[in-house]
Amino acid sequence: MSKLISEIEKIDLKLIKKNKEKIKNEIIETPVSRVLSSYLDRLLPNSEIFMKLELFQHTGTFKARGALTVANEIEKEKRKFGITAASAGNHAIAASWAAYK
């Protein structure tokens, strides 16, 4: 079993809450908004749909949480050399922001 699969299997609510606590002062608590749509009401009757408005996050996406969590796990001595992200999109923006922090 690869290390990645092994790590994924370890993810649980306690870990998520622990990491949320670690980064809470650096991340924006973004709002949640109910979606009002007659089309969706017809498509999904008796449902409520909500959006988490991550566009208000520092990087404009939810990726900031993961990038910051991982960046903070890197030893300070190694982190001073920078962070590399294999991305040209939202994750790259978040990784750059996390490295800057």
Language model regions located:
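PLP-dependent amino-acid enzyme catalytic core
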Residues: M1-K101
